[in-house]
Amino acid sequence: MCCLPVFVILLLLIASAPSVDALPKTKDDMSLASFHDNAKRTLQILSNKRYCCVYDYSCCLSWG
């Protein structure tokens, strides 16, 4: 039972610890929204290429 107060104090300290979001941003940091937009754009390009190549092979040649 004497360990219970120590355990509770540790839980409170862990909960109040600063998170990763509290770190200051630098000029090299990229926002997560921008990262998701780039990923979405890349997936759209790849899916368009896959669709194009299935139905028209000459279209694939224009992709490089």
From Swiss-Prot:
InterPro entries: T-conotoxin. Residues 23-48 form a propeptide. Residues 1-22 form the signal peptide. GO terms for molecular function: toxin activity. GO terms for cellular component: extracellular region. Keywords: Amidation, Cleavage on pair of basic residues, Disulfide bond, Secreted, Signal, Toxin. It comes from the Eukaryota. Expressed by the venom duct. It holds the Pfam family Chi-conotoxin. Contains 2 disulfide bonds that can be either 'C1-C3, C2-C4' or 'C1-C4, C2-C3', since these disulfide connectivities have been observed for conotoxins with cysteine framework V (for examples, see AC P0DQQ7 and AC P81755). It is found in: Secreted. Coiled coil: none annotated. The modification Tryptophan amide is found at residue 63. Belongs to the conotoxin T superfamily. The cysteine framework is V (CC-CC). This is Conotoxin Pn-B01121.
